[in-house]
């Protein structure tokens, strides 16, 4: 499959539904995020709970020495072309499963030891690595070749090293890594690597085909845009009552309660069911008072901030884009949620009865740290009043 023209430091390797991704970290990112305790390189990341944990540093190795490589990212595979020969191929065959194939080199996956809670052999060809820092277990098993786990000290840090390497005179090896909540159940056999890769490719192509046609000169850009959207989805889990589109699998690993509207608008014409899920994923957590959370991920619901009531405007636009959103059942559901959301602003953010609701923080407006809030709080923003008037007009 054709590689995408992207820098993995800016666009992560992932797939639709996955809670795993691989991201490049450069010197500046490591320096600006000392709390991550990471160093430059390619990191396998856990994207539960906002994607806050870089778990394994991935390095092609030969004779114990890390080798420079060139990453080539396509929707179905991340291929690391090793300087001097050899490849490491990585495929996310499922939401929590990474297939690994090495040829002419080995792969070292290094976890910072302070994140770990022990590593244990659980079979002739499988290891379990407990990572309290990510609140997850990692099971690594060999399909061909060998998997070994050891501890090592490099660059003044202690690591738990997992090595995937050819054995018995072979030049290639395959392994599988599973991220799980609790110990993973392993199948007796695994599908061939190329079969797993083909299934991912088919899933992406089906998603891409639903997108609007573009002129030939924009085809590569449209394919990249489709990949970014496709790979930003996470599967239902915990608070994620539906398949949801994150803002990014780089740094913004949540769904905020106005960004979800833009995701719904973007999908409305080409995939109305997915667009409906994006619109509703926030309203699934609406309180009895009518308030909705500021942001959600699979483990967190944040209610101490808000976002402005653009939801009526967004749903009206979605109806204009696709008649599917005017279906009676969807219209009734949207009306119920939007009515309660509108009334909440008047009941809880209009203490002086002026019918001019208030922002209590910059985050409530989406302007976050805008200088307009230097005057202090509360702020009766004309944009807020305008959004609410428009939402109530649409409801009427």
Predicted regions and their residues:
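Short, charged low-complexity intrinsically disordered segments located at boundaries
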Residues: 1, 86, 94, 253-261, ...
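Active-site-proximal flexible loops/turns
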Residues: 121-123, 266, 314, 390
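Extended, well-ordered alpha-helical scaffold segments
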Residues: 189-192, 196-199, 203, 217-224, ...
């Amino acid at each position: 499959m054709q590689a995408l023209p992207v820098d993995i430091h800016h666009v992560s390797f992932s797939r639709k539904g996955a809670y795993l991704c691989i991201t490049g970290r450069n010197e500046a990112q490591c320096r600006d995020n000392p709390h991550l305790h990471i160093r430059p390189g390619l990191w396998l990341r856990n994207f539960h709970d906002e994607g806050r944990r870089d778990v394994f540093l991935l390095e092609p190795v030969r004779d114990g020495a890390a080798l420079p490589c060139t990453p080539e990212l396509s929707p179905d595979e991340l291929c690391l072309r090793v300087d001097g020969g050899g490849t490491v191929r990585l495929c996310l065959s499922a939401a929590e499963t990474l297939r690994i194939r090495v040829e002419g080199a080995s792969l070292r996956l290094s976890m910072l030891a302070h994140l770990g809670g022990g590593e244990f052999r659980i079979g002739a060809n499988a290891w379990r690595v407990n990572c309290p820092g990510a609140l997850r277990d990692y099971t690594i098993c060999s399909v061909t070749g060998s998997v070994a786990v050891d501890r090592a000290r490099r660059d003044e840090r202690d690591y738990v090293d997992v090595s995937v390497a050819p054995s018995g005179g072979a030049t290639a090896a395959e392994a599988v890594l599973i991220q799980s909540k609790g110990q993973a159940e392993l199948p007796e056999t695994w599908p061939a690597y190329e079969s797993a890769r083909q299934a991912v490719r088919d899933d992406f192509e089906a998603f891409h085909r639903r997108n609007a046609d573009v002129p030939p000169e924009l085809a590569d850009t449209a394919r990249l845009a489709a990949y970014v959207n496709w790979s930003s989805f996470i599967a239902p889990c915990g608070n994620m009552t539906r398949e949801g589109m994150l803002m990014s699998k780089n740094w913004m690993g949540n769904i905020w309660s106005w960004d979800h509207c833009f995701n719904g608008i973007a999908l409305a014409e080409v995939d109305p069911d997915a667009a409906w899920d994006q619109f509703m994923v926030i309203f699934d957590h609406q309180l009895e008072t009518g308030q909705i959370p500021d942001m959600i991920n699979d483990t967190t619901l944040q209610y101490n901030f808000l976002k402005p009531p653009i939801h009526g405007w967004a749903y009206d636009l979605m109806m204009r884009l696709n008649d599917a959103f005017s279906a009676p059942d969807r219209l009734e559901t949207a009306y119920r949620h939007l009515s309660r959301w509108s009334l909440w602003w008047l009941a809880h953010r209009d203490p002086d009865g002026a019918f001019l609701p208030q922002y209590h923080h910059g985050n409530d407006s989406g302007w976050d740290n805008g200088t307009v809030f230097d005057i202090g709080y509360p702020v009766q923003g004309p944009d807020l009043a305008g959004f609410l008037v428009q939402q109530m007009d649409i409801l009427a």
